[in-house]
């Protein structure tokens, strides 16, 4: 596949320079270059991994996590609320960014998640109805495949009108699942008391169901991600130039006659040499939730006090840059299955079974290697706890109860921060809010050993146990806030990431309630004889004792890879994603999302980028 040399890019008359060829950046590259008269340049720090089997195979993420050829392999600072653990924070280091290294979950947010951006935060253009066309625009539902056409709509629900069919990102359903899930899904329904959603992609997804994944099953199943979907089909466009192995150091700015600042280009490093790329129209920062704020700070845009410490001249002071970091967390309940019942652990343990599933993947496009997670579901917090528990949690939310020493926003009681707390508190009271997600995982999900290196999350069942099954729990609307900032004036130094995990007690409460529910399901009468011993939490832990469950949660979490909010709309960028105080500079990636949404953020990031492309083209007709 042809790529551009750095010299060619330096000598090109570029209208737009996109920093980051990741999930959002390649959407912009494809859409902006549809206009023949526009010249687009893309800078990517990683390499191209198109056609790489580790990227393509749906179960290949475990081979990339922690591998610095594929993963930036960031680490958090020690987390006080979790006994000073240091967490692995993966980010894709290649064309496609984190869409090339994630677990390919495809979901859409609740309508209220997006409507709040518009109605409560005052961001015109960002309602659910205004974002939905862009959610559909990026998607290509594989509607002709038998497992879609002949699906049981009660098990695998969606309405055809809500789906996109002409987009770049394939979405599909797995043709294979472990037999245990035939019994698990009714047990989830009965224990929760919630019916299955009619269409979890139309703005409400409470209940349990088989879900879509970003996997292209038109031939042998492969990951569908921004490099394969948006870039590969159009890489030969003469007005699109992509250079890899090139790090953006800082955005270059100049002053206008009226004293205002504007972005003029980007300083980059390639093979140790510094180069300057000029942008005639705009510089667009799409480096992700950790590196977009880092590059802003390296460019002199950020908190003046932090920039002073780094000896970086302050061009535009904005104390919000790098703050408001939000990340969901995962914990899990793990049971062994009855003797002879298979899960992915069986495939990991048995070489002959592994060969069988490799053959299924290659020849029948099925089996565990084609994508083994099928079931997910969402429940309200209020459906799982007592009214007194709800009152206690909401009291903590509204009273600014935060662990001492945790990262905090510059103005904890400002309108933006109050809006977040009030929105989450209102959701916690509702019996229709998707506050918790449950990911049904046919393997031992080992958070105790995986937090520092996510490649160790699925080690197989422990010695002396049968194959295992996990109900993985996540809180969708975390209250804890973190930060990411540069550590020096050297743009090659990794940023300091302090997610503030579990620094707000409400996050512990919500995950603990999910752990208790997961155990009620797996120990229910409906699954008697289908499961054996509880593996995690250990049988000695009393899951009826909320304090014991809270302690368990603090020691058994990993990241969900959904970090966002560090260049938030309304704080760092405006509603058209323009950096405040600097003309011709935008940020387009997960960092602009002001608050977490209920579900994986992949589809929302694609939609934000699709919408941003239209806004950019409208501003430069």
Curated annotation (Swiss-Prot):
The active site is at residue 562. It comes from Didymella fabae (Leaf and pod spot disease fungus). It comes from the Eukaryota. Its cofactor is FAD. One of its GO terms (molecular function) is flavin adenine dinucleotide binding. It is an enzyme of class 1 (oxidoreductase). Keywords: FAD, Flavoprotein, Oxidoreductase, Virulence. Belongs to the GMC oxidoreductase family. Its EC number is 1.1.-.-. This is Dehydrogenase. Dehydrogenase; part of the gene cluster that mediates the biosynthesis of the selective antifungal agent ascochitine, an o-quinone methide that plays a possible protective role against other microbial competitors in nature and is considered to be important for pathogenicity of legume-associated Didymella species. The pathway probably begins with the synthesis of a keto-aldehyde intermediate by the ascochitine non-reducing polyketide synthase pksAC from successive condensations of 4 malonyl-CoA units, presumably with a simple acetyl-CoA starter unit. FAD binds at residues 23-24, 44-45, 102-105, 590, 601-602. Pathway: Mycotoxin biosynthesis. Homodimer.
